[in-house]
Design a protein with these regions (language model features):
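Conserved short secondary-structure elements within globular domains
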Residues: 513
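Short periplasmic/luminal acceptor-recognition loop of GT-C membrane glycosyltransferases, typified by
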Residues: 425-469, 504-510
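Membrane-embedded transmembrane-helix bundle of lipid-linked glycan/lipid transferases
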Residues: 2-412, 416-423, 436, 445-448, ...
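Structural motif
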Residues: 426, 495-497, 516
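Ligand-binding "clamshell"
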Residues: 517-523
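Luminal/periplasmic acceptor-recognition loop/helix of membrane-associated glycosyltransferases
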Residues: 454-504
Length: 604
């Protein structure tokens, strides 16, 4: 769509042209940098989880066996790349700032990825608008400042950049594009396993079909068979590479497949069953994008080239609705049934394991190229007024997402764990195991700095203790929120305290005190001005290794400490040593002024 003709002597406003990507990155730094410098993401739900893993890598880079949770578990059960970068940075700037820095890098990668991905379908100008939109996405702010899903925000942009190179490889057979695509894909896989298993496919299928549609565009003469074969080559090499780079992960998964009772999660509920679910999973992450849905459906169905992208968005949006529709549960259940029939396994429906807020983020990213076309249309017609309205809507969307945790807090009031850590690290107390009750995610903070081991932990997929896997509850520290299942799981652990060497229990919620007193624990000390109490049980023997879990071999530790982070370094080196070919274009002076009389003046 061409822009309206400009009257003589009138400047072309910046929104009427492509916004330089460097400016978009500057916007991302201005918008998110101050929040990250304030360490606002450090209060998000999973932040302490990532810092816990990073702290272990900082001290034991080539030994992923961590004895601080679940009486011992392997960190090869979670891809390590961004946590390993945190570990490296933490030696210079500390763990908290390292988390903020790594999160900032992910945020800066996102507009680059969205721009490259959007350019497959839309103009440079529209792609720059999509990149701006990615900075202000409500779903991004929800993941960064509320959920703390660092891995999701790292992996997604890497896949988007990789798929832009895959598009070049599929159409043009450029070997260097294939190499870059593979390196970036390996790096993305090293960041997050769920994004690997779902988003990589969701993002890639529209690109492949668009490459087929575009095989004759821009003077190319690619054949249908050639595009399909090159796509198969990329897919095959990707599968082989992911198996190698994440080999210790696959070994751990084979030794200990996930066999747990489903743990309740809000993203699997009907989002219209409670008002806060509607706000938390629809209004906050989607924000102003909801207003663009009619245009997305209209434009996506109307234009042939946009249909693969639209159907990918539509599919992902249905998953983003979680348990609101039966589609995700039915499809994932059917897939599990097929796998069980082929392998003879008894795999549980993945619906009961997944959380679906990340699908909203992925769907939003796929919607941005189409929404950018709407932005172009509005700005061409209404000029700076449209720019102001669109900017306001984007800013309001992000502001609401950042502010939402204040009005719907995910943590209790802050409290200090320093006295708890001090107790565990002195007088040989670390010979015994401990448990926290009512600590929430602060449990991970204790785990980072205490030398003692706990029977609890925040990573549900790594749990192997039968007292935890047979009940449908998550962390023991939050037992009461899981009803009967949570309390029964806690009671089972207390019953086997001798077996686990569980001597110390730190309680921040009086709700648990009657249960502890009945089970034989006694209150001995008070910390944090009465906020935390210590309960001790006499006669408990020192902790010893348990038979649950298989420590990785030394070779697996070496592979885990080199290949995942090495893939990201390789991708960075390739991008620096082999820059992309740039199209030759005319350099225009700024501000640009029309010197000739237009044929038609802009209607006002």
């Amino acid at each position: 769509m061409s822009s309206p003709t400009i009257a003589p002597g009138r400047q072309v406003s910046l929104p009427s042209r492509a916004i330089p990507l460097s400016w978009v990155l500057l916007l991302a730094i201005l918008v998110h940098g101050s929040l990250l410098l304030m360490q606002l993401p450090n209060d998000s739900y999973d932040a302490d989880f990532h810092k816990f893993f990073a702290a272990h890598y900082a001290a034991h880079w080539f030994n992923p066996w961590n004895e601080k949770w679940f009486t011992g578990f392997s960190q090869t059960t979670y891809p390590p790349m961004e946590q390993q970068w945190m570990a490296l940075f933490s030696h210079i700037i500390g763990l908290n700032l390292a988390y903020s820095l790594v999160q900032l890098i992910a945020i800066l990668l996102l507009p680059i990825g969205v721009y490259r991905y959007a350019r497959i379908w839309v103009s440079e100008r529209a792609a720059s608008y999509a990149a701006i939109g990615s900075v202000l996405l409500g779903s991004l702010s929800s993941l960064v400042y509320q959920a703390g899903q660092l891995s999701t925000t790292w992996a997604a942009p890497l896949y988007l950049i990789a798929l832009a190179y895959f598009y070049e490889w599929a159409r043009e057979a450029r070997f260097m594009a294939l190499i870059k695509a593979l390196a970036l894909t390996m790096a993305a896989a090293s960041a997050h396993h769920v994004t690997l298993l779902f988003a990589s496919v969701i993002f890639a299928i529209p690109v492949m079909f668009t490459a087929i549609i575009d095989r004759k565009r821009d003077g190319l003469d690619a054949t249908l068979g050639g595009v399909i074969i090159r796509s198969a080559v990329y897919a095959g090499l990707t599968i082989a590479g992911v198996i190698v780079v994440l080999l210790p992960y696959w070994v751990a998964l084979m030794h200990n497949p996930i066999k747990q009772m489903p743990i309740p999660h809000g993203s699997r509920e009907n989002f219209f069953s409670q008002w806060w679910l509607t706000v938390n999973y629809i209004l906050v992450p989607w924000g102003a994008l909801l207003l663009a849905l009619p245009f997305i459906f209209y434009k996506g169905l109307k234009e042939t080239r946009l249909r693969p992208l639209f159907f990918g968005f539509w599919f992902t949006m249905l998953f983003a609705l979680g348990g609101t529709t039966p589609f995700p549960r039915a499809l994932l259940g059917a897939m599990a049934g097929i796998v069980n029939a082929i392998t003879g396994k008894n795999i549980r429906n993945p619906f009961d394991i997944l959380t679906f807020e990340r699908f909203c983020f992925w769907a939003s990213l796929m919607a941005l190229p189409i929404v950018a076309l709407l932005a172009v249309k509005l700005i061409d017609r209404y000029g700076n007024k449209a720019s102001f309205v669109l900017g306001t809507l984007g800013a309001a969307t992000m502001a609401w997402a950042v502010a939402w945790p204040v009005y719907h807090p995910i943590h209790d009031a802050p409290f200090s764990t320093s006295e708890v850590v001090s107790f565990l690290n002195r007088d040989g107390h670390d010979k015994f195991r401990y448990l926290t009750l009512g600590f929430g995610s602060k449990m991970s903070e204790v785990g980072i700095y205490a030398n003692a081991s706990s029977v609890d932990g925040e990573y549900n997929s790594a749990r192997l203790l039968p007292e935890m896997t047979k009940y449908g509850s998550a962390q023991l520290t939050n037992s009461k929120y899981y009803g009967t299942n949570g309390i029964e799981s806690l009671r089972a652990v207390l019953k086997h305290a001798d077996q686990y060497g569980l001597k110390y229990i730190f309680v921040r919620d009086p709700y648990y005190e009657p249960l502890l007193a009945f089970a034989g624990w006694r209150k001995t000390e008070v910390y944090d001005r009465g906020n935390v109490t210590l309960w001790v049980k006499d006669g408990i023997p020192p902790a010893h290794p348990t038979p649950y879990g298989t420590p990785p071999t030394a070779m697996e530790g070496i592979l885990w400490g080199t290949l995942p982070i090495g893939s990201s370094i390789l991708a960075l080196v390739l991008m620096l040593l082999f820059p992309d070919r740039r199209r030759t274009r005319e350099t225009l002076k700024f501000p640009m002024v029309e010197s000739e009389e237009p044929l038609l003046r802009e209607a006002r």
